[in-house]
From Swiss-Prot:
<feature type="binding site">
    <location>
        <position position="177"/>
    </location>
    <ligand>
        <name>Zn(2+)</name>
    </ligand>
</feature>
<dbReference type="GO" id="GO:0005524">
    <property type="term" value="F:ATP binding"/>
</dbReference>
<keyword id="KW-0479">Metal-binding</keyword>
<comment type="similarity">
    <text>Belongs to the ROK (NagC/XylR) family. NagK subfamily.</text>
</comment>
<dbReference type="InterPro" id="IPR043129">
    <property type="entry name" value="ATPase_NBD"/>
</dbReference>
<dbReference type="InterPro" id="IPR023505">
    <property type="entry name" value="N-acetyl-D-glucosamine_kinase"/>
</dbReference>
<keyword id="KW-0067">ATP-binding</keyword>
<dbReference type="GO" id="GO:0045127">
    <property type="term" value="F:N-acetylglucosamine kinase activity"/>
</dbReference>
<protein>
    <recommendedName>
        <fullName>N-acetyl-D-glucosamine kinase</fullName>
        <ecNumber>2.7.1.59</ecNumber>
    </recommendedName>
</protein>
<dbReference type="GO" id="GO:0009254">
    <property type="term" value="P:peptidoglycan turnover"/>
</dbReference>
<feature type="binding site">
    <location>
        <position position="184"/>
    </location>
    <ligand>
        <name>Zn(2+)</name>
    </ligand>
</feature>
<dbReference type="InterPro" id="IPR049874">
    <property type="entry name" value="ROK_cs"/>
</dbReference>
<dbReference type="InterPro" id="IPR000600">
    <property type="entry name" value="ROK"/>
</dbReference>
<keyword id="KW-0119">Carbohydrate metabolism</keyword>
<feature type="binding site">
    <location>
        <position position="157"/>
    </location>
    <ligand>
        <name>Zn(2+)</name>
    </ligand>
</feature>
<feature type="binding site">
    <location>
        <position position="179"/>
    </location>
    <ligand>
        <name>Zn(2+)</name>
    </ligand>
</feature>
<keyword id="KW-0418">Kinase</keyword>
């Protein structure tokens, strides 16, 4: 059995998956804000409850909105203060008497999609999240590529490519990023960036859902904005594809629901790839909100 915890700022969700990778049980509880011992006790209690339900001890994986230290498993996650700076992996492993694996929730998203029955046929899978920010994960032969510092999937912190400046104008502001740098692509091609660019060019603020609705109705500003956004997205993704050369790209996050992306990217990407490059398959994520739990559960499966 495979147990996956999706640990967020407000809730902890546990999903239990059988040997056929089907979810057979799940439970949600609130996340303690500040109390680390309470957090450990909740995770222990949920694990033991799952063991009782299954009649066996399952493997345990945890997805967090942050980064585990690559050397000692210490957790860095501002969204879960009770776990921030704590040796969660070592402490919980000791409490439940089995190895616990922890990874970034974006990597868990990518792993979940890569283990889809159809997608498993692809040797390299790029999970790309276009949500409040931009991130994701790279899966090679069913396993996460984390990198030395566990930041392989931090795609949103690439700087805006020079070709994007041709589209947006050389005077486009280099927006300050939460990472401490300026001009990171997540400030332009995320859902938040989608709204910011509209506001920048038209001095009018609208939520992404309204912009897309205006686009569907043929409103000229919204149409021009979407065209510009798709061009910038193609430039940024083209750079990423040239570097990683995946067989499959799976798109998640709020903007993944904008179907125009899957129509436009295949037409616009070739101009930004090497001539010998073949386009990867580009698909919308299949597992939605359950992807984090699935991917966390499969952190052990990926090592088999």
């Amino acid at each position: 059995m495979y147990y996956g915890f999706d640990m967020g700022g407000t809730k902890i969700e546990l999903g239990v998956f059988d040997e056929n990778l089907q979810r057979i049980w799940h439970k949600r509880v609130p996340t303690p804000r500040e109390d680390y011992p309470q957090l450990l006790q909740i995770l222990r209690d949920l694990t033991e409850e799952a063991d009782t339900y299954c009649g066996v001890q399952g493997s345990v994986g945890i997805g967090i909105p942050g980064l585990p230290n690559a050397d000692d498993g210490t957790v860095f996650t501002a969204n879960v203060p009770s776990a921030m700076g704590q040796p969660l992996q070592a402490d919980l492993s000791r409490l439940i008497q089995r190895e616990v694996r922890i990874d970034n929730d974006a990597n868990c998203f990518a792993l979940s999609e890569a283990w889809d029955p159809e997608f498993r046929t692809y040797p390299t899978v790029l999970g790309l999240i276009l949500g409040t920010g931009v991130g994701g994960g790279l899966i090679v032969n069913g396993s996460i590529v984390s990198g030395r510092n566990h930041i392989t999937g931090e795609f949103g912190h690439f700087r805006l490519p020079v070709d994007a400046l041709d589209i947006l104008g050389a005077d486009i502001p280099h927006v300050p990023c939460g990472c401490g740098h300026r001009g990171c692509i997540e400030n332009y091609i995320s859902g938040r960036g989608f709204e910011w660019m509209y506001s920048h060019f038209y001095q009018h603020t609208l939520p992404a859902t309204d912009i897309i609705a205006h686009y569907a109705a043929g409103e000229p500003k919204a149409v021009a904005h979407v065209e510009r956004f798709m061009d910038v997205l193609a430039v940024c993704l083209g750079n990423l594809l040239t570097m990683l050369d995946p067989h499959l790209v799976v798109v998640g996050g709020g903007l993944s629901n904008f179907e125009k992306i899957y129509q436009e990217l295949p037409k616009r990407l070739p101009a930004h790839l090497l001539r010998v490059a073949r386009l990867p398959r580009i698909e919308k994520a299949r597992y939605g909100d359950s992807g984090g739990v699935r991917g966390a559960a499969f952190l052990h499966l990926a090592e088999k």
